[in-house]
């Protein structure tokens, strides 16, 4: 894609397309996520929205590779699916959360490291420490707002940030 962003690049099913729950419709091919080659239609139909969002972000768009490091924010649906998909793909996972109870749950689901953003408001620095100042290959950014600065801070040069949500707001001053 060349030139400035265009609104049409951000119109996908469920985002800005009317009729996404229709039985039949004509849409652009890039609005769909391909079914993995070895999956049946029945298996693909079991993917919930959060799982499909995580899959598209880290596998289709992010091209996650084994042994890469990914940061997932929080313990919501998209982040939990991203954590589990990344672990199944052989990646290292760092998660952020706000409590020790949630941290333990994230670890039980496979997180290699968990950073409490209440204890580390500039959690990107803690992620850098955990990665020997290399940063992460991928960030699943669901918070938006000021969190985006920390995502940029901890992303490896040339890393991939999937902006999925704006739970903390849609504006941020990039530092």
Model-derived features: positions:
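Glycine-centered, small-residue-biased loops immediately flanking beta-strands
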Residues: 159-160
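Short helix-loop-beta connector
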Residues: 38-40, 63-69, 133-134
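Adenosine-nucleotide cofactor-binding segment
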Residues: 69-72, 87-150
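Glycine-rich phosphate/adenylate-binding loop and adjacent beta-alpha elements
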Residues: 1-33
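A glycine-rich, Thr/Ser-enriched phosphate-binding loop motif common to dinucleotide/cofactor-binding enzymes
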Residues: 15-21, 37-60, 73-81
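Rossmann-fold NAD(P)-binding glycine/threonine-rich loop
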Residues: 167-175
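Helix-to-beta-strand junctions that scaffold the AdoMet/dcAdoMet cofactor pocket
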Residues: 65, 155-156
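Short strand-turn motif at the edge of the Rossmann-like AdoMet-binding core
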Residues: 143, 165-167
């Amino acid at each position: 894609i060349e030139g400035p962003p265009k609104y049409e690049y951000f119109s996908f099913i469920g985002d800005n397309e009317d009729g996404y729950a229709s039985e039949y419709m004509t849409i652009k091919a890039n609005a769909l996520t391909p079914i993995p080659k070895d999956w049946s239609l029945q298996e693909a139909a079991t993917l919930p929205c959060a799982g499909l969002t995580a899959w598209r972000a880290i596998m289709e768009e992010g091209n996650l590779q084994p042994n890469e490091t990914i940061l997932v924010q929080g313990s919501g649906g998209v982040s939990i699916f991203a954590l589990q998909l990344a672990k199944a793909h052989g990646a290292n996972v760092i998660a952020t959360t706000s409590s020790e109870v949630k941290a333990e749950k994230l670890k039980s689901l496979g997180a290699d490291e968990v950073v409490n953003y209440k204890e580390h408001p500039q959690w990107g620095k803690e992620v850098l420490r955990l990665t020997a100042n290399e940063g992460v290959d991928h960030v699943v950014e669901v918070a938006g707002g000021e969190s985006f600065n920390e995502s940029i801070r901890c992303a490896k040069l040339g890393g991939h940030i999937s902006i999925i949500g704006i739970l903390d707001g849609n504006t941020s001053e990039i530092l």
